Design a protein with these regions (language model features):
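Short edge beta-strand/loop segments characteristic of extracellular beta-sandwich folds
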Residues: 76-84
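Exposed aromatic-hydrophobic patches
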Residues: 119-124
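Short acidic/polar inter-strand loop motif in beta-rich domains
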Residues: 139-144
Length: 144
């Protein structure tokens, strides 16, 4: 029996099929550039603007973000103040920052004393795997 000889067309198709996965991987690992590039200066500026001269405390604010999200266009984020809220000291504002997003200030939430609680659930669009930060400012000037 005669063995079929590979044609030029089948060799080119096989070569393209072998080269394609490497190209896709290289594109996936390429750093974001242009308008999608991370903006560390804007991140630092947003942090400094919110904190001011206060020293942030390590406790009192709970941030719940999944380690891996199914959909980067809608990552669920929950933020909650765990300190007791009173009429003299309540949470005025919470911000959520996505460190490697082109616009790092992802969410700004403002509360009044009448809210009774300071918690929220939002969905963020994240440009890539990154650290998400949250800061809260209390009426007394404390930053969490």
């Amino acid at each position: 029996m005669r063995q079929p000889h590979p044609t030029r067309r089948s060799l080119v198709a096989a070569g393209a099929a072998l080269a394609l996965p490497g190209t896709v991987l290289a594109q996936a690992k390429a750093p974001l550039v242009g308008p999608l590039a991370p903006n560390p200066q804007a991140f630092r500026q947003a942090m400094e603007q919110f904190i001011g001269k206060a020293r942030p405390q390590a406790d009192g604010l709970l941030l719940d973000v999944p380690v891996l999200a199914d959909n980067p266009s809608g990552v669920p984020v929950k933020v909650k103040i765990t300190l007791p809220l009173t009429e003299q000291d309540w949470c005025e504002e919470i911000i959520v920052l996505a460190e490697l997003n082109p616009s790092p200030l992802a969410c700004r939430l403002q509360f009044t004393a009448a809210a009774g609680t300071a918690e929220a659930s939002v969905r963020l669009r994240l440009a890539q795997s990154q650290t998400v930060h949250a800061l809260a400012r209390m009426k007394s000037g404390k930053v969490l």
